[in-house]
Amino acid sequence: MGPRGRGGSRGGSFRGGGSRGRGRGRGRGGVNRFGKRPRFDSARVEDKEKESEEESLSEAEEDSEVPESESSDESVAEEAPTRPYMALLRSLSKGSGIKRRKLDHEPNNSEESGEDDSSESSADEDAPDDVCGDVDLVDEPEEDHDEIMEQERSDDEDEKDLTDSFNSHFASPDEVEVAERIKSITNHEWVSKRLPSKSARTVLTLPKQKDASDNASGPVPVTNPATLILKPKLKESITSQRPQLDASEQALAAPLFQYYDTLYCQRTVANGHNLRRLVCLHALNHIFKTRDRVIKNSAKLAKESADPDLEFRDQGFTRPKVLMLLPTRNSCAKMIEMMCSLTETDQQENRKRFDDSYVTREKQKFSNDKPTDFRDLFEGNADDMFRLGVKFTRKTIKFFSQFYNSDILLASPLGLRMAMGSTEEKNLDHDFLSSIEIVIMDQADAILMQNWEHVEHIFEHLNRQPKEAHGADFSRIRSWYLDGQSKNYRQTVILSSFNNPDLSEVMRVHCHNWQGKIRIQPDYQGVIQQLGVKVKQTFSRFDAQTIIADPDARFEYFIKAVVPSLTKRVKDSCGTLVFIPSYMDFVRVRNWFATSPAAQSLSFGVISEHTEVSETSRARSHFVTGRQKVLLYTERCHHFWRHQLRGVRRVIFYGLPDNPVFYKEIAGGCLGRSEQDMTLEPGEGSVRAMFSKYDVMKLERVVGTPRVGKMLHEKGDTFDFV
């Protein structure tokens, strides 16, 4: 059956969601389209006394939490190539008028959203939480650009500042330099350089330039918010809230406010709040400057209407300018709260509806053994299917605005992909992503545990030329939009607790910012000395010729070099936990244990993100009592549940986890728990980890930066640590 997660008071939240190749599931009130997942009877159990089994079963169930919702995914077909832009202009020349446009699959006739910026509509207050099974449903007409600007006015009269990164990057860039850089980007010509930094490894990557100096210094350092060029209202707010920036904020602020693509790999629970404040400040500043520039230029055009040569290029195809990709509704609520605190806006339209849909006021019921990062991620409403449009006017914030009327789009990857529709349903729509100028992905390490395919799909559809006009005034659209170069001006900011090949690939394939890219990540001390118990740790390197051949080489090494040590002394194999990061590898190993004659002497059980709670409790019980000597356990299951496994005497890492905290929890936590239960003598536990040269990022975080080079290049392939 589909992936499961917590429900109940979390507002239908669900976690997990299959392997990287499968999607996450439905939202509140949804249904499983595909029915139950076929069961694979994979366990092999040895006979034991029933009494001991029941006793251990009750112990295992104490740590289980029953999910109340299940999820499945809709696969979305790829879009056909877009038509040439000149054909688009011809098709739009007839005029489109005002359209009623929805980004949902079902109509909602019971709710209408008003445009009064000072109050909530009665329809919004009276609408049920689960209208048509979709709490994020919006049904309102798409506004024309001119109509939008007639309702608003600039909040100050600041003039153009040539030192302002907003002007130098978007409004008035050096066209010759930008053209040269874009040409280099098109030819995949980049130059990388490591910048001096005390707290992190900072790598600057710039498009190659003929006359560029090798002494590129990177972004100008930012020590406090007072040095930033911000809208006055935002500057007053941030200087009162945060007059000085700490080291982590300074590292991010410099590339962030100077519009570099940024991969920041030092996000923690401790600094997450401050980093969230910075990205919200940057997003709001960008939106307000864009809005005020358009309003001022519109006023000038109205005043000088007799001048036919007067022209202002200050808009995109559509209104949304910022996209925030977030893992859960609760993380979205934290972003919204931060924006409200920075804007200090009292008038918030549809606020009650937002609180009802995104904020869980009931006290969380986490067991005492859940770690801090788990609580931070899954507290509140942990539903991972949502999308929200937010519109800002001079005095009002409107939640649940229609996407084409919004300034900021906040969504989970699954929620946004569902909003984009599919070619199968003939409702594919991604025009609202055509003019995104800033993408912010927060808690990317958590999004990696969802369906990364959705993230790739979204990035592939960013900054494409739209299929419809959406009321745009083409005489006001910036030239680089019309030339199909908007992706070269878009800034992408990714915040994660660690780097990962998928994150690096997004930066390599989808980030074409002419300003350049910056990667910030720390040097690691490693966690092998932080287990809290004395245990022998053996790291075994195997050879894989290519990254494509790595899964096969890993499997062959496992069954030929690791499993024989278990089958030769079956009695000593009791309490063996096999940790498998990839679900595809998990299926392969599970099937081999179930069908291979070489494994017939080994009883085994399985726990994955797809395993039902009753089966999980049974597997844990059999493992504790010894009826199942080997337990196969996946990384994503541990991410979503953090099971406190008992009876572990030996840990085998089929692959190292992305998150180094998991290594410490599995190796140190499980073996330490066995010593506390006096089922394992101190110092008798063991850990064996398999790795190849393609695991360099994972290995560095586990063993430490100083050791990783030697372990990858030395002649020996076995490394022991005590």
UniProtKB/Swiss-Prot annotation:
Disulphides: none
Biased composition (Basic and acidic residues): 38-51
Subcellular location, record wording: Nucleus, Nucleolus
Keyword NAD attached: no
Quaternary state and interactors: Component of the ribosomal small subunit (SSU) processome composed of at least 40 protein subunits and snoRNA U3.
Family statement: Belongs to the UTP25 family.
Protein name, entry field: U3 small nucleolar RNA-associated protein 25
Phylogenetic classification of the source organism: Eukaryota, Fungi, Dikarya, Ascomycota, Pezizomycotina
